Amino acid sequence: MKTQDMNRDWISTASTLNKALPYLQRYAGATVVIKLGGHSMGSDEAMDEFARDVVLMRQVGVNPVIVHGGGPMINAMLDKLDIKSEFVNGKRVTDRATMDVVEMVLSGLVNKRIVQAINGQGGCAVGISGKDARLITCCQTDPDLGFVGTPQDVDPRLLRDLTEKEYIPVIAPLGADQTGQTYNINGDTAAGAVAAALKADRLLLLTDVAGVKNDAGDVLTELSAKQIEDMTRDGTIAGGMIPKTETALAALRGGVRAAVILDGRAPNACLLELFTEHGAGSIIRAD
């Protein structure tokens, strides 16, 4: 039996869709690169909700490209296999044994979990890594850190071919150098490099914080590149936020129109950012 409360819910839903029309039109045909952090993956229910959002984006004409992390899953597997980690200045050294685990977890467990979730919601996702089709060519970041790489070149042809055919690429952040040696790449860095190569309309960095905050702890909804640089210089932006804002700035310099840092644990975070007036998190634009 239908009730008035149910009718009100449907009216509210219809109103929300109506208000979203300008944004749906705005992003039709746009490429949006989404970095899905390991801490944002959470439960199977959260993964399914993220997958539904991605499938909806594809359904309304957006071209989503996903780059994922997997730090917590890598740590869990290293512990399970009793592989001890060495750290240099707080950064993990990726030796050969660790690199084998990293590739297994990222390309296998994590990547295929995301692909399965998207396909389970009616999408058509394809799981790859930066090694496929020489997507990401990298170099060693620091010999002291072992097999950790920095992107030197991104060849976006495979991604363009996939998105033109309405596939959803899901990329594990691995790359190889000119000799074929595999390297682990920071997920944020990989996402920024991919977004720049695609000249993406948006780079969405899904993390476990609500966005960039000021001294009072308030989330700043819109910032310029210069404001980010000033806040980093005076210490307002510090700690784990620095790599994310650095990725955002590098992406902007590479031709991405805007980057957004937002809480990937929040329900429908990507949809709120793209298709509502107020968005979600902190959007950073070039000066």
UniProtKB/Swiss-Prot annotation:
It comes from the Bacteria. Pathway: Amino-acid biosynthesis; L-arginine biosynthesis; N(2)-acetyl-L-ornithine from L-glutamate: step 2/4. The keyword Acetylation does not apply. Pfam families: AA_kinase. One of its GO terms (cellular component) is cytoplasm. GO terms for molecular function: acetylglutamate kinase activity; ATP binding. The record marks K35, K244 as: Transition state stabilizer. Substrate binds at G70, G71, R92, N184. It catalyses: N-acetyl-L-glutamate + ATP = N-acetyl-L-glutamyl 5-phosphate + ADP. InterPro entries: AceGlu_kinase-like_sf, AcgluKinase_fam, ArgB, Asp/Glu/Uridylate_kinase, Glu/AcGlu_kinase, NAGK-C. It is found in: Cytoplasm. Its EC number is 2.7.2.8. The keyword ATP-binding applies. Keywords: Amino-acid biosynthesis, Arginine biosynthesis, ATP-binding, Cytoplasm, Kinase, Nucleotide-binding, Transferase. GO terms for biological process: arginine biosynthetic process via ornithine; L-arginine biosynthetic process. Catalyzes the ATP-dependent phosphorylation of N-acetyl-L-glutamate. Belongs to the acetylglutamate kinase family. ArgB subfamily. This is Acetylglutamate kinase. It comes from Roseobacter denitrificans (strain ATCC 33942 / OCh 114) (Erythrobacter sp. (strain OCh 114)).
